Amino acid sequence: MLKTIQDKAKHRTRPLWAWLKLLWQRIDEDNMTTLAGNLAYVSLLSLVPLVAVVFALFAAFPMFSDVSIQLRHFIFANFLPATGDVIQRYIEQFVANSNKMTAVGACGLIVTALLLMYSIDSALNTIWRSKRARPKIYSFAVYWMILTLGPLLAGASLAISSYLLSLRWASDLNTVIDNVLRIFPLLLSWISFWLLYSIVPTIRVPNRDAIVGAFVAALLFEAGKKGFALYITMFPSYQLIYGVLAVIPILFVWVYWTWCIVLLGAEITVTLGEYRKLKQAAEQEEDDEP
C-alpha cells in the first residue's frame, strides 16, 4: 500500500520536475538576469521622462487633477517600497524642472520614454523567440497608446477605489470593501502583467498561460515589495555606506529585482506552452510506435 502511494507521488511530481528543469534551461539560455539588468538601466534613464509625460497628460485633463495626486501617491507607495517618499521628492523636483524645457526638449522626453517601451518589447520578444517584427508605425501606435491610455485607465481605477472608500460609511459593506481594497494592488499587478504578456509578444500567447504567468509574477511582486521593505528596514547597510546617496543604489536594486520578476513571469508563460507541446509530441511518438 505504501509503495503504491509512493509510486503515485513520484508519477505526479515527475511532470512538475521536468517543467522546472525546462524553465531553468530557458532562463539560462535567454540570459534573463542580463536582460533584467539592461531593462533596469533603461528604466532609470527613462524614469523621469516617463513620469513627466504621464503627468503632463493628466494636466491636459483638468477633471483628472485630483486623480493625478492619488495616482502619484499610489505609485510611490505600492511600487517603490521603503524609500518611496525620498524618491518621490527627488522625481517631483526633476519633473518640475522638465516642465521648463523647450519643445525640442519635450520631444526628447517623449523619445526617451518610448525607448523604454521599445526595450520592453524587444526583451519580451527575445524570451518568446519571436522573429516576426511589427511595422514601425504600428509599434509606435502601440507605444503611444500605452503612454496615453495607460495612465488614464490607472486613474479611472483609482477613481473607482476612491468611490469604494466613500461607501465605507455603510456598516454592511465595510468588511467587503476593506477586503477589496486590500487585494486591489495584487489585482492591478495581475491585470497589468496579463496585458503585458498577452499584447507585447508578436506571436499568439495562450490566454491561460498568460493568466498563470501573470498571477505568479503578481504574487512575487507583492511579496517582493514587502520583503524588500523589510530588508531595507532591518538591514540599513545602504544608508550606512552611501549616506544621503543611498536612494540611488536602493532604487536601482529595486528596479532590477522588479524586472527579474516581470521576466520570470514571461519565462513561466512561455514554458507552460512549450512543455505542453513537448508532452503532446512525446505522446504522439508513443502512439505511432507499433
From Swiss-Prot:
Question: What membrane topology does the UniProt entry give?
Answer: Multi-pass membrane protein
GO CC terms of this entry: plasma membrane
Keywords (alphabetical) are: Cell inner membrane, Cell membrane, Membrane, Transmembrane, Transmembrane helix
Note whether Membrane occurs among the keywords.
Answer: yes
The listed locations are:
Cell inner membrane
Keyword Membrane set for record? yes
Pfam families recorded = Virul_fac_BrkB
Transmembrane stretches, start-end? 44-64, 104-124, 140-160, 183-203, 210-230, 244-264
InterPro entries, alphabetically?
UPF0761_bac, Virul_fac_BrkB
Database matches in PANTHER family: INNER MEMBRANE PROTEIN YHJD, UPF0761 MEMBRANE PROTEIN YIHY
Fetch the NCBIfam families from UniProt: PRK01637.1, yihY_not_rbn
Q: Which family does it belong to?
A: Belongs to the UPF0761 family.
Q: Which HAMAP family match?
A: UPF0761
Q: What is this protein called?
A: UPF0761 membrane protein YihY
Species of provenance: Escherichia coli O127:H6 (strain E2348/69 / EPEC)
Coding gene?
Answer: yihY
